[in-house]
Amino acid sequence: MKYILIVIMVSFAMCISTACSGLGNKTKKEDNKGMDTAFCWEALVASSRNYPMEVHYARVGVGNSGGYVGVMERFTGSGLGEADGTVDMGSDSNGGMGAPSSVDIVWLSYLEKKFYRLNVKFSLELQDKIRQKFRTKYYDWPAKRYWAFTGFVINMLPKGHVWLYVDGIGRRELVCDTLVGREVNVPLQDFDEDGYRYRKTLDAFCEGRLRDYTWAEENFKRNGLSDGLWDTYKTKFNYEIEFKFEDEKAVLDVDYLYRFLTGEFWHRDNKPMPS
């Protein structure tokens, strides 16, 4: 009887040890996940629909590696945060790379007929904010699954302003709205050799490009460039949106988007809303 009791006690102790070991490994794994420093992402460019821009070059620094990814797309104008193209994907052998840490971009604002450059190393606070966004999964109710942000969007605005977004399936979030580039001189021949050959001057080149954006030119003639426009756009309010349906039995399903003037959007991440 004593022998049986000893065996039971030893077996019980081994079970506790194994369980604790497994819990420790799980906790360690989850902690490491929360400290991920390599992510799968791509760098993108965008601008407001009414203010089309053209990129000369754009590079995004990768973590503390000293490396960068270069944006291949030149033309923008689909909307705030609406990326028009993709990049030379720069993942390492493990399928990921460090989070964005800097931006060096030169672009042409057609309506202003000016070149701007933003060359900035992100603050540690901004780098950490971007890393946290890449680490955090968000739930997509219609798809019933989690997604991660996989896009880093450089959005150019008039007068050299730049907003930065993280972008994913069904969601886009503004992470920085305080960056401002400086006006620079770029010879048209260096920017676009064919454009220089046929247009000769920057004014003529921009006027030619704007033929593809007639609505933007019309808007510019009516409204010009408002100094306070983007400050108004980025102001956020703590709205609680309520829907009232004519049909009291109507139900608003989860498969719809919230879209904001900032260019942010996301799927409703909750259960269906009854009227």
Model-derived segments and spans:
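C-terminal motif of bacterial Sec signal peptides marking the signal peptidase cleavage site
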Residues: 16-19
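Bacterial signal peptide processing site
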Residues: 21-23
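Tryptophan-paired
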Residues: 58-109, 253-275
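Short acidic/polar inter-strand loop motif in beta-rich domains
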Residues: 108-117
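Compositionally biased low-complexity segments at domain edges in trafficked proteins
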Residues: 130-232
